[in-house]
Amino acid sequence: MLSPKRTRFRKQHRGRMKGISSRGNRISFGKYALQALEPAWITSRQIEAGRRAMTRNARRGGKIWVRIFPDKPVTLRPAETRMGSGKGSPEYWVAVVKPGRILYEMGGVTENIARRAISLAASKMPIRTQFIIS
């Protein structure tokens, strides 16, 4: 699973996802890509599941680039804990994704192989996505 090696602070505010993605919204490595159409937090497990699905489907052909990185810690309180007594401890990491953001890129394969592999990755994502070609 992806996570930062070290961070400046252990915990972060939740924040809000306004607007569309101004960075990472163009294909820059491969020829085919998966683009987000909705705002969401995508966990490191979901990113890894999508990457594995694409890799298995492509079978030694082509190259895959993961364009998002989970750099936001999500904290959880233990079950049946009373209110108060501070913020919970970091449990998992998420990538903040806005509409227009490229999630995965693929190159070195034919379009139908890329379409099939990327649709498998899309099914692992918690948001609506679209397949795009550069």
From Swiss-Prot:
Q: Which InterPro entries match?
A: Ribosomal_uL16, Ribosomal_uL16_bact-type, Ribosomal_uL16_CS, Ribosomal_uL16_dom, Ribosomal_uL16_sf
Q: Which PROSITE patterns match?
A: RIBOSOMAL_L16_1, RIBOSOMAL_L16_2
Keywords for this protein: Chloroplast, Plastid, Ribonucleoprotein, Ribosomal protein
For this UniProt entry, what is the primary localization, expressed as one broad class?
plastid
One Gene Ontology molecular-function label: structural constituent of ribosome
Q: Name one Pfam family in it.
A: Ribosomal_L16
Q: Where is the composition biased (Basic residues)?
A: 1-17
Which residue stretches belong to region Disordered? Answer: 1-21
An example Gene Ontology CC term for this record: chloroplast
Task: Write down the superkingdom of origin.
Answer: Eukaryota
GO biological process, alphabetically ordered: mitochondrial translation
Q: Where in the cell is it found?
A: Plastid, Chloroplast
Question: Which family would the database say this protein is a member of?
Answer: Belongs to the universal ribosomal protein uL16 family.
On assembly, the entry states: Part of the 50S ribosomal subunit.
Task: Indicate what this protein is called per its UniProt record.
Answer: Large ribosomal subunit protein uL16c
